[in-house]
Amino acid sequence: MAVKYEVSVTAIGKLARKFLETNSSIILLDEGAHPNLAEMVIEHTSGELNRDIIVGDTLTLGKQKYKVTRVGENANDTIHDSGHCTLLFNTTGSMPGQIELEGGPVPPISVGLKFSFSGK
């Protein structure tokens, strides 16, 4: 499997953990891309989207792996433009910038944690 997109957490907004606890979701955004959103997002290093993320790909988050089950119609574009997408863990959504995932529980999110999408 080839790595399609890989970034590391640089900052965690105060509301970002709350979103994970209450909505099983994480909002990702390039570090410094939108300072007014910093409280709500997990900021990360800038990364290059080498190929589009598609259903069947794998997200590795620390040592935990998740299967991509849906990719919103705008998710790859927003990742490419500003590292932005919303990850939904073991739940469904309908927004165009969301990526749905299934797998085990989400590990603790900390600065330095790596997010890596891989696939064919």
Q: Where does each model-flagged region fall?
A:
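Short, ordered loop/turn segments at secondary-structure junctions
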Residues: 32, 72-74, 120
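N-terminal disorder-to-order initiation segments that are Gly/Lys/Arg-biased
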Residues: 1-40, 113-114
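Helix-rich interaction surfaces within compact, conserved domain-sized segments
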Residues: 89-120
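Short, well-ordered loop/turn sites that connect or cap secondary structure elements
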Residues: 52-54, 59-60, 109
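Conserved "cap/hinge" positions at secondary-structure junctions
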Residues: 62-63, 119
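Short, structured beta-strand/loop micro-motifs enriched in basic residues and often containing a Trp
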Residues: 37-48, 91-101
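Short, solvent-exposed secondary-structure boundary/capping segments
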Residues: 75-86
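Short, conserved beta-turn/loop elements at beta-strand boundaries and strand-helix junctions
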Residues: 64-65, 71-77
